[in-house]
Structures are given as C-alpha cells and as structure tokens.
Amino acid sequence: MSGWSHRHILDLASFSLEDYSSVLELAHRFRSMPVTGARKLPALQGRLVATLFFEPSTRTRSSFELAARRLSADVQSFTPASSSLSKGETVLDTARTYVAMGADVLVVRHSSTSVPEQLACALDRSGERTAVLNGGDGLHSHPSQGLLDLYTLAHYFDSQNPLPEALQGKRIVIVGDVLHSRVARSNLWALTACGADVVLCGPPSLVPQDFVAFVEAPPPGQSHDPVQHRGCVEVVRTLEEALPGADAVMTLRLQKERMHQHLLTDLNRFHRDYGLTHERLKLCGKPVPLLHPGPVNRGVELGGSLLDDHSISLVEEQVRNGIPIRMALLYLMAAVESSSDPSLAAIG
C-alpha cells in the first residue's frame, strides 16, 4: 500500500491498476473480519469523519458511518434540514465549520457536479489538512459505489483472490439510465481500467453514443498507461444485442428527478423494452450475476422475483461490500495523512 498517493478521492479517472488492487486487497481483508465478537479496529482511533450529505441517501451514508466506526473513528453527521443552510450559509462555510471542529475527512454528497472537488481545492488553498471523499456529486462520479461494484464482481469471479485481474476479458452489460448515472460513469472507469469490456444498453435518450468517447479519452493532463490493457465500450439499443455472451449484468434506476421533461420515459414501455426478467437473462447463454446500485424500482428496471432470487441477484451483496470498501478508502486516506500505515494487527 506504499504506492497510494490520493489524499482526496474525487473520482476514479486517475486511478491506476495498482490503486484498484490496493483498495480491493484491503477491502477483502476487512471483509474477512469475524462478524461476531470485537468488530472494531483501532486504525482511526482519535480521527473524526464528518458525513456532509446535501442530498438524500440511505445506503451510502449509513455505509460510510458504519465503516468509520468499525475503524474506531468518531463520526459527525450533517443534516441539511436542521443546518444553517436555511439561513443562507454556503456549502463551503458549512464544510469549514466541520474542519474547525477537527474533521480529518469530509465525505461529501451533493446534487451539483464538482462540489466535492471545489471544496477540496478551497481547503488545499487555505492550507487545511482535511481530506475530501466524494460520496456522489451530480451526474459526475460516485467512486465508492464504483469500487464496491468492482469488488463485488471480482469476488464473484474469484472469491479467493478478488483483485482487478478477475475482471480481465469479462463482458459486463450495463442497462438503463446511463445518461443521468454517476454510478455508470464510475463503473465505466473502473471496469475498463481493469480490462473488462462494457456494453451499454438503452434508448438513445438515456444511453448517448458519445459515452464511448467519455471512457476512451484520458483525464485532462494525463495519459493512459500504454502497458495497461483497457477494456472496450460498446453501445447497443436492444437486450437481444447486449446479453448474449455477458458475464454479468448491471441495471440502473431511472432517475426521474434528474430528467428534463422531454426525457421522461414511459415506465411500462421501458420495462417492456429493457426490464430484466429470468426469461430475458437466458439470452446470456449461462447463469450470470445481476447487480443494481439501488434504490430499485421494482417492476421497472427488473422484475421483483428476479431481485429476490439470491442465486442471481447480488444487490444485497453490494450493500454488504460497501462497508469494507469504504473502510479501505478511509484507511488509505488516513495513511496518506500520517505518512504511515495505521495498525491492522487485529486482522493479520
């Protein structure tokens, strides 16, 4: 883990294969912790993690707070409804309040793109040592979700060694509202960086053709590692094109709250054309796992019986894996700050 250099975690565009390996390897160690007895590690004892969620969340917020507590960190939660935002306080001033209270990490979720990055830059300019972890910003990025999905798939393909190599050459199909999904963007970066080929499936209004260019272009000021084999991205319009040969399928929620009026999709028609069922998954030609980042619209993205079929659905596994992945991220950020690895002696 000595190669880890990300003080802030804002997206996955700049992650190297070594970075993905560091997160997945550490998360797997945390996942292997016994579920009974002493469930806390002293790694972040004396540290303060503040969760600043300016947008509603159930899974992500709870997962980060559980992750921080399992590493013995103190946790402070921010709730917009009872905050000074209603009195005109800015997001930056709110963040600075928690920094002044001694927060070591701010986990920030916001409906507007780039807010976590703007906060990180502002804190850096003022010489603060507080790190910022993006808990989801607008349509841009949701790095911890992308990483937990990556780990869930790697563990499915190789439970003994769930590292990026387990994704090499796999065909992963993502169905649904890609346009409005920060999860899709993070998954595209993670999966292709680890050598998986990704097929995006949906109507043109929800799956633009230019998403191929989105992944193939390197981040500003960077270049792709010429040695690293990156997966390809393909856009198709029907499940009949997408599913044959798939190794895993992920479906995305229709995010009506982010859609302009002319993009609103008839739900019955969407389910007819793109809703996943047991019968449709037979097009894959073999048993494949099903993922969904949640929350799920039953009867829209997929049939309720499919969601409840634990021989296929990895949705609850994704939720479980969110905790060790977020423990790994918080641990690695703390290691950068202290220039040494906090103790992991309790898990060997």
From Swiss-Prot:
Name one molecular function that GO assigns to this entry: amino acid binding
Q: Which GO terms describe its biological process?
A: 'de novo' pyrimidine nucleobase biosynthetic process; 'de novo' UMP biosynthetic process; amino acid metabolic process
One short Pfam name that applies is OTCace
Q: Which SUPFAM superfamilies match?
A: Aspartate/ornithine carbamoyltransferase
Q: Which reaction does it catalyse?
A: carbamoyl phosphate + L-aspartate = N-carbamoyl-L-aspartate + phosphate + H(+)
TM helices/strands, residue ranges:
none
GO cellular-component terms in the record? cytosol
EC number(s) on record? 2.1.3.2
**Residues the entry annotates as binding carbamoyl phosphate:** R59, T60, R109, H142, Q145, G294, P295
Give a yes or no for keyword Transferase in this entry: yes
Quote the record's binding site residues for L-aspartate. K87, R182, R253
Q: State which pathway it belongs to.
A: Pyrimidine metabolism; UMP biosynthesis via de novo pathway; (S)-dihydroorotate from bicarbonate: step 2/3
PROSITE patterns annotated for this entry? CARBAMOYLTRANSFERASE
Print the keywords alphabetically: Pyrimidine biosynthesis, Transferase
Top-tier EC class: transferase
Biological role? Catalyzes the condensation of carbamoyl phosphate and aspartate to form carbamoyl aspartate and inorganic phosphate, the committed step in the de novo pyrimidine nucleotide biosynthesis pathway.
Question: What does the similarity note say?
Answer: Belongs to the aspartate/ornithine carbamoyltransferase superfamily. ATCase family.
Q: Subunit details for this protein?
A: Heterododecamer (2C3:3R2) of six catalytic PyrB chains organized as two trimers (C3), and six regulatory PyrI chains organized as three dimers (R2).
Its recorded name reads Aspartate carbamoyltransferase catalytic subunit
Organism in which the protein naturally occurs = Prochlorococcus marinus (strain MIT 9303)
The gene it comes from is pyrB
